[in-house]
Amino acid sequence: MLVTGATGYIGGRLVPRLLEAGHDVGVLVRRADRLRDVPWAASVDVIEGDLADRAAVDRAMDGIEVVYYLVHSMGGKDDFESTELTIARNVAASAREHGVGRIVYLGGLHPATGELSQHLRSRTQVGRILLDSGVPTIVLQAGVIIGSGSTSFEMIRHLTEVLPYMPAPRWVRSFIQPIAVRDVLHYLIRAAEVPPEVNRAFDIGGPDVYRYGQLMNGYAVEAGLPQRPIAALPVLTPWLAGQWVNLVTPIPRRLAVPIIESLQFDCVMREHDIDGVIPPPPEGLLPYRTAVRLALERERAGEVETSWRNAEVEGAPSNPLPSDPDWAGHTAVSYTQLTLPTTSRV
């Protein structure tokens, strides 16, 4: 199996689980030194190269049966859309020529009609290129992913913890169907076993649908914080909202803006056909608040397996240094309420 995006949030969690399942795993990374401190690095075949370089992709594809396509340029350069399409075409053509049996791509939930954001449009086009490659492909379309260290979770967390009152853009009213990272990994792993005649996109999501503002208040309950009064301000554009999120959270604007643009739409499943191809986990899909509770437990215990920082834009001044401890860059807010008794004069 070949995993692209192995240094990212999802890829860094998928690789060790594939190894635990007994698979031979290769990873294609631009810089092998980024795997220096990864515990599973010695157990995989590391190919150094850029996905935009067709020759590097061909080297990585040799002898591969399943390709996991987990890369996207959300935090990259301004021309990320062109770069993403070039990479997708390279992977599609190389996989076809090398006789790969299955491509698994993690895309994003999006509305069936209407104008998409640049970020969602690009991810949709990548999925189409892979589906048209001639290689059996499954596109798993997920919305907000909840797990310790995920960009979406950290954005909800910091907005809720930092602001006692939430003057928010209108997307706080959008309906969201979050999914636990544990369940995303379940679908990714099982997708490799799907019969070759299956070649299509599937929506995936958890059991709950909330407005985005309700996600924040659900987090507040699990974190022991008071629920936040939220006032929607329709005047904030996605760009301005991205600046605002960058100001009050550690999420950089280049990551915040694409997420916010996708939140302009309702991010909910339009179909549940995935159940007929990949059944849910035996214990069921995690409810949102359970996923939040588990994520908080991991963060408080310092057991964050991967973080959005793994895939952050290199060189950002806010990045922790290599010499910093694992917990550097995180924040924790506790809420204490003190009630003073009063006595009447005698």
Where are these regions (language model features)?
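NAD(P)H-binding glycine-rich loop region in Rossmannoid oxidoreductase-like domains
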Residues: 33-98, 108-115
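Conserved beta-loop-beta element that borders a ligand/cofactor-binding pocket
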Residues: 107, 128-151, 155-158, 162, ...
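Glycine/proline-rich active-site loop of Rossmann-fold NAD(P)-dependent oxidoreductases
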Residues: 147-155, 191-202, 225-228
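Substrate-positioning beta->alpha
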Residues: 151-152, 171-192, 200, 214
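Substrate-binding strand-loop-helix patch
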Residues: 175-182, 204-222, 232-243, 283-287, ...
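Conserved small/polar residues in nucleotide/adenosyl-binding loops
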Residues: 335-342
